[in-house]
Design a protein with these regions (language model features):
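Generic recognition of flexible, low-complexity loop/linker segments
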Residues: 129, 156-157
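Extended, compositionally biased accessory segments flanking or bridging domains
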Residues: 1-134
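Proline-rich intrinsically disordered, low-complexity coils
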Residues: 34, 54, 62, 83, ...
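Short acidic, S/G/P-rich loop/turn micro-motifs used as interaction or catalytic elements
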Residues: 113, 132-152, 161, 173-179
Length: 231
C-alpha cells in the first residue's frame, strides 16, 4: 500500500494550516481524504489572502485571492500568465490541523501512554507521552514536524540536552533526517519513526500500523532486561 500523502504535505505546510482550496489541491486524489478532512482538520475564523497555484507552470508562486463581491472570489495569477480561477467562499476558509486529534490517534496506533505536553521553545514539537515496554521502564515519545534538515537538527540537539535517557523521535517522514541527526540519535539509543512508513489511515478515523509494534520499537524493547538478569 502506498504511503498516505498527507504526512509529506503536513511536513512542508507552514503553520500546519491552509485554505481549503490548498488542502483539496494537495490531497483530493487520496481516497481517505474526506475522512481525514472531517476528523483531523479544524475550521478557523480566517480567510486566505493567497492560495497555491493550480497550474504546473514551474514558477510555484501563490495566487492572490481577490473578492469583488461575496459571490465573485477569484485567485489571480500575479504574473498574468494564466486566467483567474473562480473560488467559493468555503474554499478560501483556512483550516488548520487538529493537532490534539492527530497526536491522540498516533498514540493509540503505536500503543503510547498518552500524556501530551507542548515543548517550550521548540516549534511544532510535542511530548506525546511514554512508550512503556514493561513496568518500571518508560521512554519519552516526541513528535516534531519540521520543514528543513536544519530545523530538525536544532530540535534533536535540544532534546538530547533536555532528556537524560533514550527517547523516541517521531516525524511525518524521514525527508529531513540527516546523517548527523541519525548519529546523534544512535548515540542516545533513540529510535526514529517516520509516520508515513509505519501508519496508514483506516476506514474509521484512526491509524493502523503497517507492521507489528514490537518491530517498530525493537531498539527499545532490546534494552529491557531479561527476567532474573538482575538488570
Amino acid at each position: 500500500r502506498m504511503s498516505d500523502p498527507f504526512w509529506a504535505y503536513l511536513e512542508r505546510l507552514p503553520g500546519k494550516s491552509a485554505a481549503l482550496f490548498d488542502w483539496d489541491k494537495a490531497l483530493s486524489g487520496w481516497d481517505r481524504y474526506p475522512l481525514f478532512r472531517d476528523h483531523f482538520l479544524q475550521l478557523t475564523k480566517n480567510h486566505a489572502t493567497a492560495v497555491d497555484c493550480p497550474t504546473e507552470c514551474g514558477l510555484g508562486c501563490p495566487r492572490s485571492v481577490v473578492t469583488h463581491v461575496k459571490t465573485n472570489i477569484r485567485a489571480i495569477c500575479n504574473e498574468k500568465e494564466y486566467p483567474a480561477v473562480q473560488l467559493t467562499t468555503r474554499q478560501t476558509l483556512i483550516y488548520r490541523l487538529k493537532q490534539s486529534a492527530i497526536n491522540g490517534a498516533i498514540c493509540a496506533a503505536l500503543g503510547i501512554e498518552h500524556r501530551e505536553a507542548k515543548l517550550d521553545g521548540l516549534p511544532h514539537t510535542w511530548r506525546l507521552g511514554d512508550f512503556i515496554p514493561t513496568a518500571g521502564m518508560d521512554f519519552p515519545v516526541v513528535l516534531t514536524m519540521q520543514d528543513s534538515k536544519d530545523a530538525l537538527a536544532e530540535v534533536v540537539r535540544s532534546l538530547c540536552l533536555s532528556i537524560p535517557k533514550p527517547f523516541v523521535l517521531i516525524a511525518p517522514t524521514r525527508l529531513h533526517l540527516s546523517p548527523a541527526v541519525e548519529t546523534l540519535l544512535a548515540q542516545r539509543s533513540s529510535p526514529f519513526i517516520a509516520l508515513n512508513e509505519e501508519l496508514h489511515l483506516g476506514d474509521a478515523p484512526w491509524f493502523l500500523t503497517r507492521r507489528d509494534k514490537a518491530a517498530i520499537f525493537a531498539p527499545l524493547i532490546g534494552q529491557v532486561p531479561e527476567p532474573d538478569s538482575g538488570g
